[in-house]
């Protein structure tokens, strides 16, 4: 099947300035992400960035770049600018791969595209089972609850679903009911155009989760369990050192 990968790569980062260009074993991080995307079989891969230095690094690795504005409030807004500049038709399948995921398995990039293509829905994503209490109660690990057909009911930084009987006895174990949302999305290009026309929703502003805008406006998000779990993403200096060691 045919799909396009867009990799948002914002240069500024509060905790890690110039994050896309941070060296991981001899290559900028964004180049590692580009290589994972190439392994997925995508028809076209575009790095969306607001900085010329990132553009030069990607082009030196043979990649395609779209320079975007620096004032976007979310990765989806950056994608929308690329969709318009490239003139993608409304039915084009777009996969959003985060620019700070150098260890993302190529198989799940393709998986989210295939899941979207098989359904009459505007957006798809992935999740993975949570097995540790530390992760279940970590607000940085976003949880998702699904309906019987695999569509998202809600995303939250809180521990959902709350296992009342289990947690009343102990918070040391979590059972097998929690799913962690993985930050990879598939969309049809027309859906991205609709998304950015909607006003931000109260729920997304409370949780700081942009996917909640989709549910607020009554649209569906399909969620599949990932065929492989991504390695460490890079949000902090400690993450960077961990990834360097794991990829060595």
Swiss-Prot record:
UniProt similarity note: Belongs to the KdsB family.
Q: Please report the organism this UniProt entry assigns to the protein.
A: Salmonella arizonae (strain ATCC BAA-731 / CDC346-86 / RSK2980)
Q: Provide one Gene Ontology biological process annotation.
A: lipopolysaccharide biosynthetic process
Predominant place of localization: cytoplasm
List the InterPro entries. Cytidylyl_trans (IPR003329), KdsB (IPR004528), Nucleotide-diphossugar_trans (IPR029044)
Metabolic or biological pathway, per its Swiss-Prot or TrEMBL entry? Nucleotide-sugar biosynthesis; CMP-3-deoxy-D-manno-octulosonate biosynthesis; CMP-3-deoxy-D-manno-octulosonate from 3-deoxy-D-manno-octulosonate and CTP: step 1/1; Bacterial outer membrane biogenesis; lipopolysaccharide biosynthesis
Give me the Gene Ontology terms describing cellular component: cytosol
- Annotated function: Activates KDO (a required 8-carbon sugar) for incorporation into bacterial lipopolysaccharide in Gram-negative bacteria.
Would I find Nucleotidyltransferase among this entry's keywords?
yes
Q: Which residues form a coiled coil?
A: none
* Enzyme Commission numbers on file: 2.7.7.38
Q: Which keywords label this protein?
A: Cytoplasm, Lipopolysaccharide biosynthesis, Nucleotidyltransferase, Transferase
GO MF term list: 3-deoxy-manno-octulosonate cytidylyltransferase activity
Cell compartment(s), UniProt:
Cytoplasm
Is Transferase a UniProt keyword of this protein? yes
Query: Top enzyme class of this protein?
Result: transferase
What name does this protein carry?
3-deoxy-manno-octulosonate cytidylyltransferase
